[in-house]
A protein has these predicted regions:
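A short hydrophobic beta-strand segment most commonly corresponding to one strand
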Residues: 89, 103-119
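Glycine- and acidic-residue-biased ligand/ion/polar-headgroup-sensing regions
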Residues: 59-61, 65-71
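A short, N-terminal "cap"/entry segment at the start of jelly-roll beta-barrel domains
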Residues: 1-38, 118-130
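Short acidic-glycine-tyrosine-enriched beta hairpin
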Residues: 77-93
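Conserved short histidine dyad/triad with adjacent acidic residue
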Residues: 26-29, 42-57
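Short beta-strand His + acidic residue motifs that chelate non-heme Fe in jelly-roll/DSBH
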Residues: 54, 73-74, 90, 96-102
Length: 130
């Protein structure tokens, strides 16, 4: 028998509100619902004009894919404009933060998964003159 899990990401729990970020985005982290053991995935729907805090990882590499909308990614000290179907690979130690354009920004994020691997950078934008 095939071993797989199928679900719709929009039907998973929106975790943003329980972390005080409901005004900024929807955030779906269906790793457990999918039964993932070594990988992670998330759907992040950033509201128009909103910025997400930055973060890095200790060991996890990530790939972000723009599903819809537009915006700007803060990647280390660089800024990269984003549009649908852009993909960005990030080494663990590279700072990443996102800002939605006027039409919002929807991202799928994929990566390896290790507990307690994230290092938050809440002042990423202001520390880089933005």
């Amino acid at each position: 028998m095939a071993d797989y899990t199928h679900l719709n990401l929009l039907e998973t729990e929106d975790d943003a509100a329980k972390h005080g970020m409901g005004d900024t985005l929807e955030a779906h982290f269906p790793r457990e619902a999918l039964g993932c053991e070594r990988t992670g995935v998330s759907l992040q729907r950033i509201k128009p004009g909103q910025r997400l805090f930055g973060h890095t990882h200790k060991t996890d590499e990530e790939i972000y894919v723009v599903v819809a909308g537009s915006g700007t990614a803060l990647l280390g000290d660089d800024r990269q404009e984003l549009r649908p179907m852009d993909a960005v690979r990030l080494a663990p130690e590279t700072l990443r933060a996102f800002e939605a354009g006027p039409d919002g920004l929807e991202l799928l994020a994929f990566g390896t998964h290790h507990d307690d691997d994230s290092v938050m950078a809440p002042d990423a934008w202001s520390q880089r003159g933005a």
